[in-house]
Amino acid sequence: MRGGKEAARLAEVERSSCLPPVADTDDPHAGMVWVPGGTFLMGDTYYPEEKPLREVTVEGFWMDRTEVTNAEFAAFVEATGYVTVAERPVDTTTHPGLPDYMKKPGAVVFVMPNDVSGTGDISQWWQYVPGANWRHPGGPGTSIENREQFPVTAIAYEDAQAYAAWKGRALPGEAQWEWAARAADPDAPASRAQPQEANTWQGIFPIINEADDGFVGIAPVGCFKPNAIGLYDMIGNLWEWTADAYEDAPGSRVIKGGSWLCAPSYCLRYRPGARQPQEADLATTHLGFRTIVSGSVP
């Protein structure tokens, strides 16, 4: 499928949910998976920022089995009145020299082009859209109606932190996230192949999306098989925030997991060891999050 009408047509027939929502219960670990502790070689050798391989020990913890959904984030906003970064007035003192359209609240949105001149210029498919936010992830005229079980997007780091604090939880550190993505297996292979059980880009990025996995964009949570300890969508679908600062990019945090925009011809970060920086105050529509909490062995 190329950009434009064909992509929109396919999107209309996608599933709206794959897993039932987490039941309302007093169990503090409802909807979470226990990740046993262990020691492993963290990192990878594919891209420079993934090196060096280093031995890391992680204590056991609980982690959300899926990325936080629109429904879950909506419950947080309803309970607290929270306003996300993408909905607030833009602080032009922090970001001087912005063009006028970027001085309005909004988020960065993937817009599938019909053609591109190489893949070096990401502005060919990424656009800052005034009015885009978690309620309107594609901008004005879009909504999350009938998308309650899709992962919430257009979430800045501060927003993810606020939700986690409200739940009495935290964002995972990079080592915790990577260990969980490896299914707590120190011998998990560092595969370079495009994963079959993950929402990634099939075709020529960014102009042809064959959508062989049934999704031309983001999938509802839990549509693909979980990993060996029961965590869904750790690879693909959305990048995920971690609590760790990115060492060579001031004001940025480490994000992990790749997204539905990763393809063999572009990105190649659908691997547990992959990482990249993300500006903490930038809301985008290929990035979400999940939470963790310390606890005892179940």
Feature annotation, model-predicted:
Residues T285-P298:
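Short, structured beta-strand segments at or near domain termini in extracellular proteins/domains
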Residues Y47, P52-R54, A74-A79, P89-V90:
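Short Gly/aromatic-enriched secondary-structure transition segments
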Residues D64:
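An anion-binding catalytic pocket shared by soluble metabolic enzymes
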Residues F61, F76-V85, K167-G168:
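Short capping motifs at secondary-structure boundaries
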Residues A8-E14, W34-V35, L41, P89-Q276, ...:
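Functional-site microenvironments in short loops/helix caps that host divalent-cation chemistry
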Residues R2-D26:
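N-terminal pre-domain segments of enzymes
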